[in-house]
Amino acid sequence: MDRRITTRIVTAGCFALLTCWAVPLTAQQQGKGAAGSTNSSYEAYVPDTVSPEAQQVLRMMTGPQGLPLPEPNDIEGWKKIRNYVPPQLKEIAKNSEISKRTSDAIKRYPSTSKEGNLGGVPVVEIASEKWQDNRKVLVYVHGGGYVTGGPDFGLGGWVSGETGLRIISVGYTLAPEAKWDRITDQVVSVLHALEEEGYPPKNIAVLGDSAGGGLAAGAVLKMRDKGLGIPGALVLWSPWSDITETGDTYVTLKRADPLLNYKLLLKKAADAYADPKDQKNPYVSPVYGDYSKGFPPTLIQGGTKDIFLSNCVREYRAIDSAGGTAVLDIYEGMPHVFQGIVFGAPETQQSMAKMKQFLATYLGR
């Protein structure tokens, strides 16, 4: 298989949180000397109500497994695990059917990328080769639990091609090298720099997945509170909108989520990002924000196999109950940030069509 395709599958599958430390195991590998600890209470179930493509990927996931994680403020410890790519994810990439779906999508939207700097923050600019300048832009805020990941957006060309937008992917400083306040300010700086370059706020959209979803929403709240222009639209994929273990599905989906486990994977990452006393600050956990003062139209997408489902619902309710415009778009049987996990499946295509329609409706108004 083309090495470029393998790389794209791995980065697409990793961009949310799988980059280092949420490792799906095949049934044969589970319990046979795999590194790290596993969620032994995981109850595998592949519903027949999802697409065959999604069923294929879900069968390859048998529960969260994590590397032994550093203590929250161990900077060198976190650095050491960031370049780890799970061998199990490489195996998924080698699957001929999955690789063909990814290859077909990549070939449909070849793209270019270049590194840059906006507002003193590293960024990567990504655009489909068919992109034409329409003075609109999509700012992408990556996931990875705030402690992993980077601005190399595995789905960037596809998203650019589908939406017709140039993408600016933010290379914010990872925790614990920086804490939430500095990281949030970096996202604000990028958005403000685009305004200074002549982009009206109404022509700027923001996409954030997982931790990046929480960060994107928190940054927009901070922009509003500082009196800066707020973006025209916001899209959140499985947002980590409450980094404390608060919410129904942290408990009720604990055994059903094939990727995430709070105690095993998320707690130390949350503490690396924000001290416990700050974790319900609205800029850290935006479900606690005051949305009555204004907020962009927001599309929230998630799945029913994700412990962040309550984060999706609570974020939606916070915006909607304050009179804001919000759309909650939930997909049957889908795991955390499924757009990068079941890439090429009908569910991902449907979610992208919904996002495309949403941005066309609200961006530039």
Say what each PLM segment does:
Residues 11-21:
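Bacterial N-terminal signal peptides
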Residues 29-41, 45-81, 107-365:
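Alpha/beta-hydrolase superfamily serine-hydrolase fold, recognizing
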Residues 81-116:
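A domain-start/cap signature at the N-terminus of enzymes
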